[in-house]
């Protein structure tokens, strides 16, 4: 027993003077980037306005804790092109813009940058990686967001957030990141992103969207109609063209309905029950066209009468 104790003490002394391997701090995949509705709308609008060129801007927000990055607002940078280089970032414009935003009640700091990839997915090119490394030199947790305004449709925004991987950790065969939480959702990487160095030179960060009551009211009021829209008078020539289109559609549907009535005479009860399955019902479409034409003409007539009466 004393022999084992001596061996244990010797091992402890060797451990004290030797270099024990220690666990390094790996990147945590539970870190999430929360983008506000205002910032997302601004990025999409800026990216759509710059098509087919790439555009760039800076993101304002705060680092809440080790696992949360809030992006509250964004502003555009005055350049566009096929690539965004480090030299293209104008520090004078950035400083002036931040000063003006502070005067309007935006004291947030720069948490990263965004740029658009119109039509070719979300990934970082070599120039983008150099730009992101320049941002990470100022802040280790800076985030690069890539948005595709061409592939983005209503209900599905093509967007992703990235951060570069330290090449020293890759040289030591360390993991680029370590999954420590089941929170968040990583998008399935595309083949283009894997070809351009995803999980080798940079890694993806989950993105979430958090809206409060004021943002929900703002989004609901975007396409909200007012009472003026109901009484507005359209161009009479345009209204006449629409009536012609309605009449042509009704004539075509009437012919189809007449043909359908002739075909029903030779059908059995089972065939009549399934005759409109997977097909257009001309009778119902005629009723829809008539209802739409009547509503448009009634509203146009009433709006014209109100305008004439009020101006007399």
Curated annotation (Swiss-Prot):
Q: What does this protein do?
A: Metalloprotease component of the 26S proteasome that specifically cleaves 'Lys-63'-linked polyubiquitin chains. The 26S proteasome is involved in the ATP-dependent degradation of ubiquitinated proteins. The function of the 'Lys-63'-specific deubiquitination of the proteasome is unclear.
For this record, the Gene Ontology CC terms, alphabetical, are: nucleus; proteasome regulatory particle; proteasome regulatory particle, lid subcomplex
Q: What is this protein called?
A: 26S proteasome non-ATPase regulatory subunit 14
Q: Share what the entry says about its subunit structure, partners included.
A: Component of the 19S regulatory cap of the 26S proteasome.
Q: Give the PANTHER family listed for this entry.
A: EUKARYOTIC TRANSLATION INITIATION FACTOR 3 -RELATED (PTHR10410)
Q: Does the keyword Metal-binding apply?
A: yes
| EC number of this enzyme | 3.4.19.-
Q: Does the keyword Protease apply?
A: yes
Q: Which Gene3D superfamilies match?
A: Cytidine Deaminase, domain 2
Q: Which family does it belong to?
A: Belongs to the peptidase M67A family. PSMD14 subfamily.
Disulfide bonds, paired cysteine numbers = none
In which residues is Zn(2+) bound?
115, 117, 128
Q: Where is this motif: JAMM motif?
A: 115-128
The MPN domain, residue ranges: 33-168
Q: What is the lineage of its organism?
A: Eukaryota, Metazoa, Ecdysozoa, Nematoda, Chromadorea
List keywords of the entry alphabetically. Hydrolase, Metal-binding, Metalloprotease, Protease, Proteasome, Ubl conjugation pathway, Zinc
One GO MF term on file is: metal-dependent deubiquitinase activity
Question: Which CDD domains would you find in this protein's record?
Answer: MPN_RPN11_CSN5
Q: Name one GO biological process term.
A: proteasome-mediated ubiquitin-dependent protein catabolic process
* Lineage top rank: taxon: Eukaryota
EC top class, as a word: hydrolase
């Amino acid at each position: 027993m004393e022999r084992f104790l001596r061996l244990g003490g010797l091992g402890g002394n060797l451990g004290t003077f030797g270099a024990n391997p220690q666990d390094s701090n790996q990147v945590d995949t539970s870190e999430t980037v929360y983008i506000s509705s205002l910032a997302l709308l601004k990025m999409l609008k800026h990216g759509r306005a710059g098509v087919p060129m790439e555009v760039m801007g800076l993101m304002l927000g705060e680092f809440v804790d080790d696992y949360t990055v809030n992006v509250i607002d964004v502003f555009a940078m005055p350049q566009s092109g096929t690539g965004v280089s480090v030299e293209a970032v104008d520090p004078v414009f950035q400083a002036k813009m931040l000063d003006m935003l502070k005067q309007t009640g935006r004291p947030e700091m720069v948490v990263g940058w965004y740029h658009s990839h119109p039509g070719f997915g979300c990934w970082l090119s070599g120039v983008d990686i150099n730009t992101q490394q320049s941002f990470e030199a100022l802040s280790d947790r800076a985030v690069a967001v890539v948005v595709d305004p061409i592939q983005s449709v209503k209900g599905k925004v093509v967007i992703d957030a990235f951060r570069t991987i330290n090449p020293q950790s890759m040289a030591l065969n360390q993991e680029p990141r370590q999954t420590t939480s089941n929170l968040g959702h990583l998008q399935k990487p595309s083949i283009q992103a894997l070809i351009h160095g995803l999980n080798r030179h940079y890694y993806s960060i989950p993105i979430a969207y958090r809206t409060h009551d004021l943002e929900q009211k703002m989004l609901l009021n975007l396409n909200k109609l007012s009472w003026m829209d109901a009484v507005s008078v359209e161009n009479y020539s345009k209204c006449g063209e629409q009536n012609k289109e309605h009449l042509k559609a009704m004539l075509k549907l009437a012919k189809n309905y007449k043909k359908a009535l002739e075909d029903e005479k030779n059908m059995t009860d089972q065939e009549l029950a399934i005759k409109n399955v997977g097909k257009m019902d001309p009778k119902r479409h005629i009723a829809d066209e008539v209802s739409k034409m009547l509503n448009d003409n009634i509203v146009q007539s009433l709006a014209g009468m109100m305008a004439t009466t009020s101006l007399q």
